[in-house]
Amino acid sequence: QEPIPDEQKQVAQLERTEIVDGAHFYAHVANDTSVAALQEQIGASCKRPLADSTYEPKAGHTCCARFTVDNEWYRAKVVSRAATEFTVFFLDYGNTDVVTRDRLRPLDPSLGPQALSPQAVECRLAYLVAQPANDRAEGEEAAHALSDAAWGEPMLARVEDRDAGVLLVTLIDEAKANINEELVTQGLLRVAKSFQKRAAPLV
């Protein structure tokens, strides 16, 4: 079977929230008011004083975590612990932080990921690979290039495929330029050695 035509593929306007590397990022669906509404609920719930002074979440547990940059509370998952510090992953934005125990709170089950799905959409540039952002100059340059491509502005994403919940996308800017192709042309990304394009519409 031939791959389906581009015009039949799902498209969405995305606003990026976190760049992992030059081909991997997290985003929100543009103009989705549910993120702000959820954040209000989380802020109100997590600001309450900690009733149990011995609270100490384990790796893999979800919780409230107070982000170092803006001191606001967000839903998070504990990734790891080293001595008195916890590395957390923010479920609704895709970024990470290292915080101390006093910046963690239990998460109300009604706000947990089982009740309300994480709002950060994990995406990869379809069929492309990059050096890790912290691995040599090429990886850092690729991450900066993806970040500079209309950061903070909605960008059209054409969904080429899905892989274990991750969207494989082609990004198109306002000038209808193909960001994926531009990053490859600049030598910042390379095409994966092997991949199989979907030959049926995404459901």
Range-by-range predicted roles:
Residues Q1-V203:
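Intrinsically disordered, low-complexity segments and flexible domain linkers enriched for serine/proline
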